[in-house]
Design a protein with these regions (language model features):
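Hydrophobic alpha-helical segments, especially transmembrane helices
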Residues: 7-8, 199, 214-216
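A short, hydrophobic C-terminal helix/tail in secreted or cell-surface proteins
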Residues: 191-212
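Short, surface-exposed polybasic-aromatic patches that bind anionic ligands, especially phosphate groups
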Residues: 26-188
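Bacterial N-terminal signal peptides that target proteins for export
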Residues: 2-10
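C-terminal membrane-anchoring or membrane-association module
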Residues: 207-226
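Sec/Tat signal peptide C-region and signal peptidase I cleavage site
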Residues: 21-25
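Bacterial N-terminal signal peptides
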Residues: 11-20, 203-204
Length: 226
């Protein structure tokens, strides 16, 4: 049974999410890490960033068209499912819902190194929702893995299922995707009252250049990050 206070905190959290874009209009993101999982020369899985002063925040990239580097910073607008018109890929509600659902699967698997391949497939599945060219370098086995995850995305998703997701959209994109100072990311915030507090206080509030997306050499592999 859900306590009444929990229910009201949930309402407050959703309300704050609705106002997040204006409250976070001048927010900042700094890339701080990308893990060590590489597929097809690209870093996959959650990356880590300082977002509005909150360090070590897991963020999931949905943007294969742009690049990010460890230590780089850029201004962001924080969107949600009520403000997709301001997000990088616009009003692609179904694709953003699918990306959020795939993100949940990724985060549930990421803690176990034996799931590294599946986490890689999930990253490419998310990228391919918005940019099919992300799949160009994959082999047949990898493509099958990506397709398998895409086929599992439920067809009846709704924005309300992802009220604890925010979309960190880079500012300063001169000509849409591919012209941004950094990549767009999805990020989960704590549910219930914690989400409300996170959004409230986050709104108040270098490392060597490592390429995050382009296919280049990563340590001990022909690799890169996305």
């Amino acid at each position: 049974m859900i306590k009444l206070t929990q229910k009201w905190w949930g309402v407050v959290a959703v309300a704050l999410l609705c106002f997040a874009p204006s409250a976070f209009a001048n927010s900042n993101l700094t890339m701080t890490g990308a893990g060590n999982n590489v597929m097809d020369g690209v870093y996959v899985g959650p990356y880590y960033a300082t977002v509005n002063g909150v360090a070590n925040s897991p963020v999931i990239c949905d943007d294969f068209a742009d690049e990010s580097y460890i230590g780089s910073s850029w201004n962001i607008t924080t969107n949600n499912f009520s403000t997709l018109g301001s997000a990088l890929w616009g009003n692609q509600t179904q694709n953003y819902e699918a990306a959020a659902w795939l993100t949940l699967q990724m985060l549930s698997l990421n803690g176990n190194s034996s799931n590294a391949t599946q986490v890689g497939y999930l990253s490419f599945a998310i990228w391919s929702l918005f940019d099919k060219s992300a799949l160009n370098g994959l082999n047949s086995t990898q493509l099958a893995g990506v397709d398998s995850w895409l086929s599992k995305v439920p067809s009846n998703l709704t924005p309300g299922e992802f009220a604890n997701f925010v979309i960190l959209t880079p500012q300063g994109c001169k000509n849409g995707p591919g012209s941004c100072p950094g990549q767009e990311f999805l990020m989960m915030v704590p549910e219930g009252g914690a989400a409300a507090l996170y959004l409230l206080f986050a709104g108040l509030s270098c490392f060597g250049a490592m390429l995050l997306r382009r296919r280049r050499q990563a340590p001990s592999a022909t690799s890169s990050m996305a």
